[in-house]
Curated annotation (Swiss-Prot):
Protein name as catalogued: Cell division suppressor protein YneA
Location relative to the cell: Cytoplasm
Matches recorded under InterPro entries: Cell_div_suppressor_YneA, LysM_dom, LysM_dom_sf
Similarity comment text for this entry: Belongs to the YneA family.
Keyword DNA damage annotated: yes
Domain of life, per lineage: Bacteria
GO BP term (any one): SOS response
Species in which this protein is naturally found: Listeria innocua serovar 6a (strain ATCC BAA-680 / CLIP 11262)
Domain LysM: 39-90
Keywords attached to this entry: Cell cycle, Cell division, Cytoplasm, DNA damage, DNA repair, Septation, SOS response
NCBIfam families, alphabetized: PRK14125.1 (NF010723)
Record flagged with keyword Metal-binding: no
């Protein structure tokens, strides 16, 4: 069979397969890119998971107890203790954290 004969016979199938491959690649890139949206915060001296919950739970739309449970599970904290200098992943999307940390200054001030 020549290429022209194959194309004439199966062009709909070939276009369908190519479209599926392109859409699959786009979907995979989207899913892979969205996996790292959670924020990572530096633990300061005297901080605890509950202190982080006080500070960030409202931004994550979670109750404080749920926030603490999520942080312990995702960061493999069996005893629930963190020490200064540790980095902890919290269930707050980076965009929410950046938006709330920035300040807006009025032009006349």
């Amino acid at each position: 069979m020549t290429l022209k004969l194959i194309w004439d016979k199966f062009y709909v199938s070939i276009i369908f397969v190519i479209t599926c491959l392109v859409l699959g690649i786009i979907l995979m890139c989207t899913v892979i890119g969205s996996g790292s949206e959670y924020s990572e915060v530096d633990v300061n001296e005297g901080d605890s998971i509950w202190a982080l919950a006080d500070q960030y739970a409202a931004k994550s739309d979670m109750a404080k107890a749920d926030f603490v449970s999520w942080v312990e599970k995702e960061n493999n904290l069996t005893d629930g203790h963190v020490k200064a200098g540790d980095y902890v992943v919290i269930p707050v999307h980076e965009t929410k954290l950046q938006r709330s940390d920035s300040t807006i200054q009025l032009a006349n001030q």
